[in-house]
Design a protein with these regions (language model features):
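Membrane-embedded alpha-helical bundles that constitute the cytochrome b-like, heme-associated redox core
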Residues: 1-228
Length: 228
């Protein structure tokens, strides 16, 4: 395996090692928090705080994981000398990447609701901008096609938006019952999307050949399912 091949498995490896175990902990703490609040089950008082704190790390981790995936996809599509748009476009994309990362850090640190909303939107726009680049493969961009709803990329965008909402609205979720209910609904949807991501991510990994295999694989006729 080349350096490029190792970079391509960085995103799924981090998801398996860090993100999905964290999802399990956050979901378990969420269930315990709800039991303690609604059913008066005697769980330790810290379960709510732990759920909130770990959920915050999960949300930020998911956004960072998506940024890693997009960066690798764009940077390794072609050798540096053949990069489409040259140094100018590479510089612009680097600024977008750094700005998105800085916005995520600012969202993490901001206290005012208006600032949290602004930085969450800026972060999402940055993710969408990087994801819209031609180097990023998407199964379909047509919401009316079935392929769109099977897309690992678009499900990733959706779960990123849900994570940013949870991160930005965290103080209000703790105080407002209506937002708390909305957060529960969003979290259930996010859990379903994470399951979908596990399936579609595995599917897409099977379709990505190693660097030295690409010339032979891409010479095949995928419609007729034949290789020379």
């Amino acid at each position: 395996m080349t350096v490029t091949d190792w970079l391509w498995i960085l995103h799924p490896a981090l998801a398996v090692v860090l993100i999905y175990p964290l999802i399990g902990m956050v979901v378990r703490l969420a269930w315990q928090t709800r039991q303690r609040r609604v059913a008066q089950v005697k769980h330790p008082p810290v379960v709510g705080r732990d759920h909130s704190d770990l959920g915050r790390w999960l949300a930020a981790g998911v956004v960072l994981l998506v940024l890693i995936a997009l960066t690798v996809a764009i940077a390794t599509k072609a050798p540096p000398a053949d990069f489409s748009g040259g140094v100018g476009r590479a510089t612009q994309l680097s600024i977008v990447l750094l700005g998105t990362g800085a916005s995520l850090v600012a969202l993490w640190r901001s206290k005012a609701a208006a600032l949290r909303l602004s930085f969450s939107l800026i972060t999402l726009i940055g993710v969408l901008t990087l994801g819209a680049q031609p180097e990023v493969w998407r199964l379909s961009d047509d919401p009316l096609s079935s392929a769109f709803w099977q897309s690992h990329y678009w499900a990733g965008v959706a779960v990123t938006g849900l994570m940013l909402f949870s991160l930005a609205a965290r103080p209000e979720i703790l105080r407002d019952l209506r937002l708390r209910r909305l957060h529960v609904t969003a979290s259930v949807l996010a859990a379903l999307l994470f399951v979908m991501q596990g399936i579609t991510g595995t599917r897409d990994l099977l379709e990505i050949p190693l660097s030295w295999q690409k010339p032979a694989v891409y010479a095949c006729d995928f419609d007729l399912q034949r290789c020379p």
